[in-house]
Amino acid sequence: MIQPLAYIHPQAKIADNVVIEPFVTIHKDVEIGEGTWIGSNSVIMDGARIGKNCRIFPGAVVSAPPQDLKYKGEQSTVTIGDNTTIRECVTLNRGTALDKNTTTIGSNCLLMAYVHVAHDCVIGNNVIVANAVQLAGHITVYDYAFIGGSSAVHQFVEIGAHSMISGGSLVRKDVPPYTKAGREPLSYVGINSVGLRRRGFSAATIAEIQEIYRIIFLKKYNVTKALDIIEAEFTPSEERDEIINFLQNSQRGIMKGFGNT
């Protein structure tokens, strides 16, 4: 159902069963999947690729040009997966040719009111980003991560899968998978054991993750030495290998350990 007071460019591609409320503006180079709902006063700009059964609340702006002085008007996109909710006044900027040329939001995500996602970010599946979080450009957020409200994340930071960041955090360094992060400066405060249990991780797996991070953050080793110990003492597993790969590939370095200054 498309309300007559909405403006939709005749070349926009709108699937079946899409509901578009009054005063929505949809530009030319837009694709919207079936079953999606677009709330009043939202603006869907060129380059938007929206999946099925999404909910985009009033005042959201999807696929705005990147806030990057190097951007010269080249074609780029914002891609949103299926079953994702974009709440009021969220702003999603499309990618730039100097990086991925797209900004990606996965499936089954929740971006709460006033979130900003800058150009070339990649957000995985089942991610929750709470109210007023500000993500700078080129950030990667992996599956099942949670970012607490009013946090600000520095460009190029990576936030690992199943991690949890407390509200109001300034995130300048990478946050490894399965961890909880808090305090200022942002530091390791444990593993996200509650979230892991909710997602079906066994007690043995959670205990192993906890012991791995005890070596990384509590034993005062440098990262290289900690990884050598982990590889020698722990049997290869999906979780162990994900932690090792994340730390080995970190470009900005990881957050501080508990009690470090």
Regions found by a protein language model. Name each.
Residues 1-5, 10-11, 16-17, 53, ...:
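Terminal amphipathic alpha-helical/low-complexity segments used for targeting or macromolecular assembly
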